[in-house]
Amino acid sequence: MRLLYVIKKENPMDQMPNCPKCQSEYVYHDSINFVCPDCGNEWDNNEIQESDDDQLIVKDSNGNLLAEGDNVLLIKDLKLKGSSEVLKKGTKFKNIRLVNGDHNVDCGKIMLKSEFLKKA
């Protein structure tokens, strides 16, 4: 039988984080995960810290911040490498994903640089 303790934070020096879902201060540590008894959320504190540090900042050609799921437009004609096709200016890409690398926007079947895109 395992005993789980609920610890109420008394001072800011405690190591127990608030629940990221409901911000409850009543959390407990269960082997490798933290658990919130109020909302039932379970999380690994290392994952949350890594996701905060790894925020990807991508700007379009006009300096606007791009986010996951945005719609973007091409600002100039681009030749596809290894093909005779050309992507025309004004082509709209929906629901983009941001990734690390020199081609930092994933538009589904192709990857593009954010400098050739503007937010729609």
Curated annotation (Swiss-Prot):
It comes from Haemophilus influenzae (strain ATCC 51907 / DSM 11121 / KW20 / Rd). NCBIfam families: phnA. This is Protein YjdM homolog. It holds the Pfam family YjdM. InterPro entries: YjdM, YjdM_C, YjdM_N. GO terms for cellular component: cytosol. Belongs to the YjdM family.
